[in-house]
């Protein structure tokens, strides 16, 4: 089993852990939806993802910034869905 942890912000990242909690890989958030998909594709078999559930934008952010974050989060969710990676929001 491989565990995928995602901090969904544009300045967030993705961590991959093995069964024993050892870090396999830890990367800054890929820049494009295709890069996100391609990275996650390497870990689609026998994996589960914990995706940080960020319910709203940051206080003081503009509406366009909040929309950009929501779109980016949607790209993450769709990549996980398309690859069949079980996802838990926490």
PLM feature segments, named:
Residues 1-90:
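Phosphate- and other anionic-substrate recognition elements at nucleic-acid/protein interfaces
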């Amino acid at each position: 089993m491989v565990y995928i942890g995602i901090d969904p912000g544009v300045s967030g990242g993705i961590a991959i852990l093995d069964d024993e909690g050892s870090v396999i890989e830890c990367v800054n958030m890929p820049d494009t939806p295709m890069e996100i998909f391609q990275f996650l594709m390497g870990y689609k078999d026998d994996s589960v993802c914990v995706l940080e559930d960020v319910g709203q934008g940051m206080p003081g952010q503009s509406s366009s910034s909040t929309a950009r974050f929501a779109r980016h989060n949607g790209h993450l969710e769709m990549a996980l869905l398309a690859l069949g990676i079980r996802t838990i929001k926490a």
